[in-house]
Amino acid sequence: MAVDTEKTLRNQVLYSIYVRNYSEAGTFAAVQADLDRIKALGTDIIWLLPIHPTGEKHRKGTLGSPYAIRDYRAVNPEFGTLDDFRHLVDAIHDRGMKCIIDVVYNHTSPDSWLAEHHPEWFFHKPDGSLGNRFGDWWDVADLDYSHKELWEYQIETLKYWARLVDGFRCDVAPLVPLEFWKRAREEVAAVRPG
């Protein structure tokens, strides 16, 4: 947590959900149907693991890792539609809980929207192909934050989601420049204070 995070948040109960494995249906609607039970457990905040589409290229297993994100600005269609996600977040709020989502900004899937449209924003191996700095993460390509246009894109994406959710859990945050996070916090606070 950031230094200026409200102390009361440090004692909140988080309930983590990976939508794909949460129920047999693996959908936003199935999570929504279970919210009363989750609330009764004393939950204050629901933390959703990545909600975005998973890449196809170099998948780990048949389903792939949810941290190999194909499009930061979309929801995984296996989980439902964007409207289904909005309904879930509204239902969470209706029960007095908050919702946070995972933000995976160090890397994407190698066949992501960003890799297709902005390959220059990625780390490249000596042979020129997209790569990552960790050998066992073969299903992802690392982003290169020396490109300020990438900062703009990522911050706009955070602001988009901040209009829906209450906050973010930032995966491998130390691998993304601290200055990026400082700027992102300032800009997101203009959309969702606190």
Language-model segments: which ranges?
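Active-site and adjacent substrate-binding regions of carbohydrate-active enzymes
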Residues: 1-194
